[in-house]
């Protein structure tokens, strides 16, 4: 099982997302279950390397959010139109 350390994101919107991407990170969201949705930020290079491995899209991943482990699956991925960059990922709780 794959474990990914993430950080909670407080700033939202286009400007905040652009600043994240300039810092080699990108926004994501975790939703589903009985808990509220959480906006998070992921390291781009680490996530891109994990994405290339088989099973990234169909296996259960573990996100460490503020020291708490959350089991999720990838729901949707958004990519840059012509660069090999991830721009956003939706995770759904399992």
Curated annotation (Swiss-Prot):
What sections of the protein cross the membrane?
none
Question: What does UniProt give as the signal peptide span?
Answer: none
Picking any one GO molecular function of the record gives: structural constituent of ribosome
Record has RNA-binding as a keyword: yes
Query: What biological processes does GO assign it?
Result: translation
Q: GO cellular component terms?
A: cytosolic large ribosomal subunit
Q: Name one Pfam family in it.
A: Ribosomal_L25p
Q: Which Gene3D superfamilies match?
A: Ribosomal Protein L25, Chain P (2.40.240.10)
Q: Enumerate the UniProt keywords alphabetically.
A: Ribonucleoprotein, Ribosomal protein, RNA-binding, rRNA-binding
- Quote the function comment for this protein: This is one of the proteins that binds to the 5S RNA in the ribosome where it forms part of the central protuberance.
Assembly state and interactors?
Part of the 50S ribosomal subunit; part of the 5S rRNA/L5/L18/L25 subcomplex. Contacts the 5S rRNA. Binds to the 5S rRNA independently of L5 and L18.
Family from the record: Belongs to the bacterial ribosomal protein bL25 family.
Any idea what this protein is called? Large ribosomal subunit protein bL25
């Amino acid at each position: 099982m794959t474990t990914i350390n993430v950080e909670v994101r407080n700033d939202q919107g286009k400007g905040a997302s652009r600043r994240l991407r300039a810092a080699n990170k990108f926004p994501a969201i975790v939703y589903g279950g009985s808990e509220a949705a959480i906006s998070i930020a992921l390291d781009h290079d680490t996530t891109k390397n994990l994405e290339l491995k088989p099973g990234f899209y169909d296996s259960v991943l573990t996100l460490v959010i503020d020291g708490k482990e959350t089991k999720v699956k990838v729901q949707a991925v958004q990519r840059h139109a012509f660069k090999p960059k991830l721009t956003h990922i939706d995770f759904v709780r399992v």
